Amino acid sequence: MQRKQFLTTILGGIPLLTFANFDDETTSTRKPFTVKGGKGRYGEDIKFLGVHPNNTKISGKDTNQQLSVFEYIGLGKVGPNLHMHLHQDEVFYVIEGEYRFVVGDETHRLKAGDTIFLPRMIAHTWIQLTDYGKLIYFLQPAGKMEEFFQKMNSLTERPSDEEIKRINLEHGIVNMGPP
């Protein structure tokens, strides 16, 4: 009778293995940390288009490349070119301001408190509609977005369109041009 109970317990637990995480987590940060508002993880200050703070809050290095989190502070009515991520999903949460997102053939208008999910492999862009705005956004998995932002931030001159496409592709992004 004990053997039957043992087998029932073991076999009954097998479906629970689907929820187990077998990833090697040895490279993840194992201690809590905070990043102050307006600051980037590791003290790095990244700017979008050389002006708008776009700082890493949680690095892919912290999560074994499973997730990265960024804070964007928009100081004007701008946004990225139409593009597509080959390997990452994105989630945007609007803290302040108003934004228009175009995802595939759908258009969404978001304001403070709204969230949007952008699946990988679907072309998308957004533009800030107010003079000031703030977003928190997540990429899953982290991929090479931090490196992409660092590379773009380090450029001293505006690169050619071909150079922009090459840099994007090196980081898992297909640049499709203006919105």
Question: Residue spans of the language-model regions?
Answer:
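N-terminal export signals
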Residues: 2-25
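C-terminal segment of N-terminal export signals and the immediately downstream linker at the start
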Residues: 20-51, 154
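A short glycine-rich, His/Asp/Glu-containing loop-to-beta-strand
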Residues: 46-82
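Short, conserved beta-strand element in jelly-roll/cupin
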Residues: 73, 86-101
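Histidine-centered catalytic micro-motifs
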Residues: 81-87, 125
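Short acidic-glycine-tyrosine-enriched beta hairpin
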Residues: 106-120
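Ligand-binding loop in jelly-roll beta-barrel domains
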Residues: 120-146
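Acidic/histidine-enriched, glycine/proline-rich intrinsically disordered or flexible terminal extensions
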Residues: 151-179
